[in-house]
């Protein structure tokens, strides 16, 4: 089983499977995956009009059986039209076969209101979650998909404190109803009294419990006949791949899955031992990052598409061959690789040579800008921070993560209480850190965690299911070329490959922090869902 060590920003770093370290996996994502903070709600930012407009209708919190729910009604202007919707925020009780409570899942569901009688067969529903493990759905919820979003400045960074909540004209609600799911010990979700939270911590356990939530929701809200989609980010894509087969085995066939900043095969991102694959697959993202910071030579800066294609080809040919030679690569052959790798990363030949041709992401983040004090982000390498320890090997923090966590937590807490009318004194766990450890892989002795074969089986058994992969060019957590590699190694037939959509965006792991990418992601998802819907009779 692979073990993993948490990075400072919470993203998982897997190493070779070691029987003595089996149950020490993933201390969260990101993203995302992404040190938990139990932050109190901050006031929403004043504006010329209320940051949160009054709802058209409100209801007091209701209790249905063991479920605590708050149902409110709202409207938003998108694409020049008024979209009315119902929001349900609350907890759903999950019980065992004996009727004993096991957990209370917090969720927020959005349903478009059309004024007509509701026909579930005509309205798709998408179940959305983030990753970690240990991340609540707030990142996608208030960053990309929900009808409200956290206000960002022109650089894609939170404006506060205090933080503002604004309308999101790029909400996915115009294309699909949505259910945002917080797994146990994230958000407001908790294990029931007397139940150990550890019972939910693991690859298989997580798939089973989130899958059971989805089944219960479909039943309780009469959505079995709706076209059904999943959307996951970061480790959430690992979960989504597992769910693709789990749900199918339980009579739930999906129309499509949206994978955002995906990691399905952990061998593609996990440096360690003799695994050279990540060094090959991270390289194009290094080049994209160096280009963004204008560190590449003039020739490479002329045409990014041409440069990226050139680097990708070199990575899987000359570079891969050179790494495969190991210590036998010497003399002029080694010198040629050092020179090319230095050119494509903008690092010095001396650094490349001393790194033995293998540049770890953390080292690249530290060295790219030249002095060790200015560092680039891991989740988005466009962003720059100042490291207080310039001589250390790894960055002290991730500027593309630390700027966001308090903002998302406080904004979501205020949104849940003030707008969705869900009352809870629990801290909203945007990123639960050690609260989901240890994370069981449940696959002892089987090498790196790899759920790509699981997804491939589901695609063969459900050949109408479509999949979409979305990646950012400057993501140094789940690099885009690793996703390309995984897709091309799923052994899909030509017909099934037609069901795969591949999308690229400016930005990093949370590419939706870039306004243009947020708009493009919205359009791409709407088109994807429309194409995956059954043909009208």
What are the functions of these language-model segments?
Residues 173-176, 183, 200-218:
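Alpha/beta-hydrolase active-site loop
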Residues 325-477:
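Alpha/beta-hydrolase fold catalytic core
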Residues 147-151, 247-343:
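A catalytic-pocket lid/entrance helix-loop region that shapes and gates access to the active site
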Residues 506-517:
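Catalytic histidine-centered segment of alpha/beta-hydrolase-like enzymes
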Residues 222-235:
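Alpha/beta-hydrolase fold nucleophile elbow
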Residues 42, 47-59, 99-199, 488:
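N-terminal cap/lid subdomain of alpha/beta-hydrolase-fold enzymes
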């Amino acid at each position: 089983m692979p073990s993993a060590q948490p990075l400072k920003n919470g993203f998982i770093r897997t190493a070779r499977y070691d029987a003595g370290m089996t149950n020490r996996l993933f201390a969260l994502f990101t993203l995302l995956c992404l040190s938990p903070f139990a932050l109190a709600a901050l006031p929403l930012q004043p504006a010329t009009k209320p940051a949160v407009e009054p709802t058209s209708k409100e209801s007091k919190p209701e209790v249905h059986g063991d479920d605590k729910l708050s149902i409110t009604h709202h409207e938003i202007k998108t694409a020049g039209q008024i979209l009315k919707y119902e929001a349900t925020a609350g907890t759903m009780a999950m019980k065992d076969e004996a009727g004993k409570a096991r957990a209370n899942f917090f969720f927020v569901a959005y349903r478009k209101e059309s004024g007509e009688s509701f026909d579930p067969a005509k309205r798709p529903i998408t179940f959305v979650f983030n990753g970690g493990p240990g991340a609540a759905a707030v990142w996608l919820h208030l960053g990309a998909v929900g009808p409200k979003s956290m206000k960002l400045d022109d650089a894609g960074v939170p404006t506060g404190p205090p933080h503002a909540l604004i309308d999101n004209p790029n909400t996915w609600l115009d294309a699909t109803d949505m259910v945002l799911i917080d797994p146990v010990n994230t958000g407001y979700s908790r294990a029931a009294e007397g139940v150990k939270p550890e019972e939910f911590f693991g690859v298989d356990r997580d798939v089973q419990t989130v899958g059971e939530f989805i089944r219960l929701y479909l039943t309780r809200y009469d959505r079995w006949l709706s076209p059904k989609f999943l959307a996951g980010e970061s480790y959430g894509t690992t979960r989504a791949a597992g769910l693709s087969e789990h749900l199918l085995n339980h009579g739930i066939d999906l129309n499509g899955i949206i994978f955002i900043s995906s990691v399905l095969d952990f061998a593609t991102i996990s440096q360690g031992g003799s695994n050279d694959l990540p060094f090959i697959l991270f390289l194009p993202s290094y080049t994209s990052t160096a280009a963004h910071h204008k560190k590449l030579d003039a020739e490479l800066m002329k045409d990014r598409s041409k440069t990226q294609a050139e680097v990708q080809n070199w990575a899987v040919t000359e570079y891969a061959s050179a790494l495969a030679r190991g210590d036998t690569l010497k003399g002029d052959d080694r010198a040629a690789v050092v020179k090319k790798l230095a050119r494509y990363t903008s690092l010095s030949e001396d650094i490349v040579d001393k790194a033995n041709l293998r540049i770890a992401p953390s080292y690249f983040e530290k060295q790219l800008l030249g002095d060790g004090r200015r560092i680039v982000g891991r989740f988005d390498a466009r962003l720059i921070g100042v490291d207080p320890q310039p001589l250390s090997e790894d960055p002290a923090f991730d500027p593309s993560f630390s700027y966001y966590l308090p903002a998302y937590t406080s904004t979501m807490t205020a949104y849940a209480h003030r707008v969705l009318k869900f009352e809870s004194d629990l801290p909203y766990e945007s990123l639960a850190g050690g609260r989901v450890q240890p994370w069981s892989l449940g696959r002892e002795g089987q090498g790196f965690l790899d759920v790509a074969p699981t997804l491939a089986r589901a695609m063969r058994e459900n050949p109408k299911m479509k999949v979409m992969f979305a990646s950012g060019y400057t993501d140094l957590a789940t690099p885009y070329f690793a996703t390309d590699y995984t897709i091309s190694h799923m052994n899909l037939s030509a017909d099934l490959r037609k069901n795969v959509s591949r999308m690229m965006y400016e930005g990093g792991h949370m590419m939706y922090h870039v306004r243009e990418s947020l708009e493009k992601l919205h359009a791409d998802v709407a088109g994807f869902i429309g194409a995956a819907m059954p043909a009208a009779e």
